[in-house]
Regions:
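Short alpha-helical segments that sit at the start of domains
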Residues: 2-58
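Short, compact, well-ordered microdomains
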Residues: 72-122
Length: 124
């Protein structure tokens, strides 16, 4: 493995209205959907789940490389910050879940590479 490969470089995001800037860490739900966590302090590994690639009640599967993003409450502006950082491309699709609406995004090619690398490293 070459440490200069793009998947070895962290993806950064933020700040948003409420959250400070941080580094993206990908997770995977048991159902296979992608989760996104923002690590705020890399030294202490303090994390804040700034955007959980939600599985909103009744929502269709987000698709391969797709995510449902929480952009309300403390996560206001997070989907837009993820797009600005080159992590996702917002598709304009939305899904109402109760009183809130989740935004649909698709991971960029670079984000897919980083996600696959991070998940592979954890499974070793």
């Amino acid at each position: 493995m070459n440490p200069t490969d793009p998947q070895h470089e962290p993806l950064r995001v933020g700040p948003t209205k409420i959250l400070p800037a941080g580094v993206i860490q990908f997770q995977e739900y048991l159902s296979g959907e992608t989760g996104i966590e923002v690590i705020i302090d890399a030294r202490t590994r303090e994390s804040y789940v700034a955007t959980v690639a939600l599985v909103p009640y009744g929502a269709p599967h987000p698709g391969a490389g797709g995510v449902w993003l929480k952009g309300w409450s403390e996560n206001e502006g997070v989907p837009q910050a993820l797009e600005l950082a080159g992590v996702v491309r917002l598709t304009g699709r939305k899904h109402r879940s109760g009183w809130v609406i989740a935004d649909h995004g698709e991971l960029t090619e670079r984000a897919l590479q980083v996600r696959d690398h991070q998940l592979h490293q954890r499974k070793r």
